[in-house]
Design a protein with these regions (language model features):
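Hydrophobic h-region of N-terminal signal peptides that target proteins for export
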Residues: 9-17
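Surface-exposed patches in mature extracellular/periplasmic domains of secreted proteins
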Residues: 59, 100, 158, 240-244, ...
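Short, glycine-/small- and polar/acidic-enriched structural segments
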Residues: 20-154, 158-162, 167-173, 177-183, ...
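A bilobed periplasmic-binding-protein/Venus flytrap-type ligand-binding module shared by bacterial periplasmic
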Residues: 40, 110-119, 209-224, 278
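Conserved C-terminal helix/tail region of periplasmic/extracytoplasmic solute-binding proteins
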Residues: 291-325
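Positively charged n-region of N-terminal signal peptides that target proteins for export
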Residues: 1-4
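Secondary-structure end/capping motifs
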Residues: 220-304
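Pocket-lining segment of extracytoplasmic ligand-binding domains
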Residues: 165-258
Length: 325
């Protein structure tokens, strides 16, 4: 009888906690919802880290490009958003008070994959390359990779193709001669006979790629919520990095992205064997990584000199309050 009473009390306590959970809407691009870039969020959901922190977390699909993820913070669609640093910087320079509160991905690895007949960079001269947003860091890094291998902007044509899945389709249908692909779509393409020419990391130093952003005004008014979110995400990063949890992480990747088991294994091996610092240890923000992202934007012409300081786009108080940084 005592055991039954204890169980009922526990159930009531859990229901009360759930009813008092703080709602938190997180904006995520449609193109990233079933990608590796959503992994930390899905792990935090599946492992109950948001619930543990007293958050009623929901992921809100946001159509459009990176700019729209910032707009979602201003039009009431989302409280926080996944966003690439390039779009955050441009929005802040245009007057947004959006700021990075925790890192999601560093040092992304994009493969430049081409049709089989393109055996070298020289073979891409005059060809069509499907690229991500012109002002984004993916395109900047791929243009730099091409330049390092003898191809200047006038040597090839480009077409905007948003998202790795659509770029893979552009390649496989024959519309594009080469495209940058993230994981595991690069593995898929190579298994189909397409040719790897190089990696974005061959051309650019490590930089801060994606972050969770919030408006300064909203974050300041909801500091406890932001800190709870940061703690939950930190737990997810630690879980992903724990080799003893590898099978569970692989299952999450397969279930949420549609990757095959083999491609999920290849992706984690690429990231962690050896550790290429693609994911932060606990969501910490690298000031140097943000500086490198800004420098890359300057090199690509996305922003003009004098370049802004990294601190303008980062607010570390939430990571500090969570005991992470």
């Amino acid at each position: 009888m005592r055991a039954i009473i204890a169980a009922l009390l526990c159930l009531c306590a859990c229901q009360t906690a759930a009813s008092q959970a703080i709602p938190l809407r997180y904006g995520q691009a449609y193109s990233a919802l079933r990608s590796i870039f959503a992994l930390p969020l899905f792990v935090a959901e599946r492992e109950g880290y948001f619930v543990r922190e007293g958050l009623d977390f929901s992921m809100v699909p946001v159509p459009g490009g990176g700019e729209r993820l910032i707009w979602a913070l201003h039009d009431g669609t989302a409280d926080m958003s996944h966003v690439a640093t390039a779009f955050l910087v441009q929005a802040a320079l245009a007057g947004s008070d959006a700021v990075a509160v925790v890192a999601e991905f560093n040092n992304p690895i994009y493969s430049l994959v081409a049709k089989p007949e393109n055996k070298s960079y020289a073979d891409l001269k005059g060809k069509l390359i499907g690229v991500a947003a012109e002002t984004g860091s993916i395109t900047a890094s791929i243009r730099k990779l091409l330049a390092l291998n003898g191809l200047q902007r006038d040597d090839y044509r480009t077409r905007f193709v948003d998202g790795t899945p659509d770029r893979l389709a552009c390649l496989t249908t024959g519309d594009c001669d080469a495209v940058p692909l993230g994981q595991p779509h690069d593995f898929v393409a190579m298994r189909r006979g397409f040719r790897l020419l190089g990696l974005s990391t061959d051309a650019v130093p490590e930089y801060l790629y994606t972050v969770t952003a919030a408006r300064r005004s909203w974050a300041a008014a909801n500091k406890d919520t932001v800190v709870r979110y940061v703690r939950a995400l930190a737990s997810a990063f630690k879980f992903i990095r724990d080799s003893a949890r590898r099978a569970e992480v692989l299952k999450t990747i397969v279930d949420t992205t549609g990757f095959s088991q083999a491609n999920a294994e290849l992706t984690l091996a690429l990231y962690f064997e050896p550790d290429r610092r693609v994911l932060p240890k606990a969501g910490e923000i690298s000031i140097n990584g943000m500086e490198q992202a800004i420098a890359l934007m300057g090199e690509s012409g996305a922003i003009k000199a004098p370049l802004p300081t990294a601190e303008r786009f980062i607010d570390l108080q939430y990571l500090q309050a969570a005991g992470i940084q």
